[in-house]
Design a protein with these regions (language model features):
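Bacterial Sec-dependent N-terminal signal peptides
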Residues: 1-16, 470
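N-terminal periplasmic/intermembrane-space "pro-region" immediately following the signal or transit peptide
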Residues: 10-77, 85-94
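Short loop/turn motifs that connect adjacent beta-strands in outer-membrane beta-barrel proteins
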Residues: 43-48, 88-93, 145-148, 187-198, ...
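Sequence/structural signature of outer-membrane beta-barrel proteins
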Residues: 58-60, 66-69, 104-106, 149, ...
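Outer-membrane beta-barrel transmembrane domain signature of Gram-negative proteins
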Residues: 111, 117-143, 164-171, 242-268
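Exposed, low-structure sequence patches enriched in small/polar residues
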Residues: 135, 228-236, 240-470
């Protein structure tokens, strides 16, 4: 499933710009039951425009929390995010503008410091003053289209892959990255019932901590045959060296030319998913491989030592009731045990690319480097309302340190839709042990904890959205 400004209906216009796991479940149930999976970048209706308003309020008792909420930052304290979204769609051109006004009343919290690739995890406070009392523009951009071909530029949030909790390569955990793109607007017929979808994108310039420019270049290719879907993507993080001249023109074609490829970080990602509409079941498996030079050795020899995976299922109309559903998702990015003997690079660990983060948050799997993440959930969903309860178990630094960070979390989300108004409530209760890797072996055997090891956080988010269609 590719969620790139997908539209279930006009009533969900702004909601699908601001994706979260509940919205993905609502969208998927609609698609699975009706046998429709729309990937369109903009609505089908021509010569139309819509105006939406969203008001978010949050309260948080400790360290930052929440993943996959379009890069929104919820530190200790309370605050609000006020936003508007205007978009226009015609036969050949579409554009959207999404100003956001952010007010954070943040309370200082002293936490053990996390370093390196763990410094961009979601529970680490951001220092930038940009996150407080600032005006930002999100989901803003321009698209030109002819027939089924689209090209344009914007900073819309993206998601690639069949998961709703994680993707190995692209999620909306971080703010949307400004990028250029070209691709098809939806699945296009190829042969018989076989259809395809394609997108090629290159990010605008980003800068690492040394001030060097770098880019993300990627393509996505999907094939669908009836209820079976195959996906492949390739991501190259390129640039990042002050002594190697590199520009956006180079980034535009690096996927084709392979120029300086031995210096760049590459991920090749695959997934397969199967839908069973008669039973309301969806199952999937996503696997990804890092590609590095290993000191001039052939990376293909060691590709199995770099594999990450994400697998899961979602079942709608469960236990004989149309409104009941359940599912699980398990992501594994644990670094191999023999990393100090056999070349075994870690996911998202390159400082030259800010550990695969944008403005302090990782754009791929939020659990991050050397981690695993298990989510199980059950819920009630109908056309107007939903309530979903989930339990999450997550570990960070599994190979890096003993004991690793361990997170237990319970969560509940409630939504209600009335005409063009959508109300969303999300509450999470999080408990972490060994935060910041402050504990060592003796703490485990003695069942003791160092100061700062145990962290508890409760976070509440309330969102009210309304959309006008013209």
């Amino acid at each position: 499933m590719i969620c790139f400004l997908s539209f279930v209906s006009f009533a969900f216009s702004q909601i699908t710009y601001n994706l979260n796991p509940t919205i993905l479940l609502l969208k998927e149930k609609y698609s699975l039951i009706n046998g429709i999976e729309k990937l369109k970048i903009f609505p089908i209706k021509k010569d139309s425009f819509q105006l939406g308003f969203t008001q978010n309020y949050y309260y948080n008792t400790n360290h930052p929390n929440f993943e996959n909420h379009n890069g929104f930052y919820f530190p200790k304290g309370f605050g609000s995010i006020s936003s508007a979204l205007f978009y226009y769609n015609s036969k050949y051109i579409s554009f959207s503008i999404g100003p956001h006004r952010i007010i954070n009343n943040e309370y200082h919290k002293v936490l053990p410091q996390k370093k390196d690739s763990f410094s961009v995890n979601n529970d680490v406070p951001l220092e930038s003053i940009e996150n407080s009392k600032s005006l930002k523009f999100r989901n803003t951009g321009l698209s030109l289209h002819y027939s089924s071909l689209y090209l344009g530029y914007g900073n819309w949030n993206q998601w690639w892959g069949p998961g709703i909790h994680n993707s190995l390569v692209m999620t909306n955990n971080a703010e949307g990255i400004a990028h250029y793109f070209v691709g098809t607007s939806d699945y296009q017929p190829l042969v018989g019932d076989l259809k395809y979808y394609f997108k090629y994108m290159v990010s605008d310039v980003m800068h690492n901590n040394a001030g060097a420019k770098y880019f993300l270049s990627a393509y996505y290719f999907n094939l669908r045959y009836n209820n079976i879907e195959l996906g492949k993507s390739r991501h190259i993080l390129n640039g990042g060296y002050n002594d190697i001249p590199w520009s956006i023109n180079d980034a535009m074609d690096v996927l084709i030319t392979q120029n300086n490829i031995k210096y760049w970080d590459e991920i090749v990602d695959y997934y397969i998913s199967a839908n069973f509409p008669s039973s309301g079941l969806k199952i999937f498996l996503e696997v990804g491989f890092l590609n590095r030079s290993f000191n001039e050795k052939d990376p293909k020899v060691y590709s199995d030592h770099t594999m990450g995976s994400n697998l899961g299922l979602r079942k709608y109309s469960a236990f004989g009731y149309d409104e009941l559903m359940f599912g699980f998702e398990y992501t594994r990015l644990v670094q191999g045990l023999y990393y100090d003997i056999i070349p075994t690079p870690n996911w998202y660990d390159n400082i030259k690319y800010n550990y695969s983060s944008y403005r302090g948050r990782r754009w791929a799997a939020h659990s991050g480097a050397d981690s695993d993440d298990f989510l199980v959930f059950i819920g009630y969903i109908n056309d107007r309302a939903s309530i979903i309860y989930g339990v999450n178990y997550e570990r960070h630094g599994v190979t890096y340190h003993f004991p690793p960070e361990v997170k237990f979390e319970s969560r509940i989300s409630v939504s209600f839709k009335y005409k063009n108004t959508f109300i969303y409530l999300n509450y999470e209760n999080e408990y972490i042990e060994h935060y910041g890797f402050v504990d060592v072996n003796r703490n485990v055997w003695n069942e003791t904890f160092e100061p700062g090891s145990i962290q508890r956080t409760q976070t509440l988010l309330i969102s009210i959205e309304h959309t006008f269609s013209f």
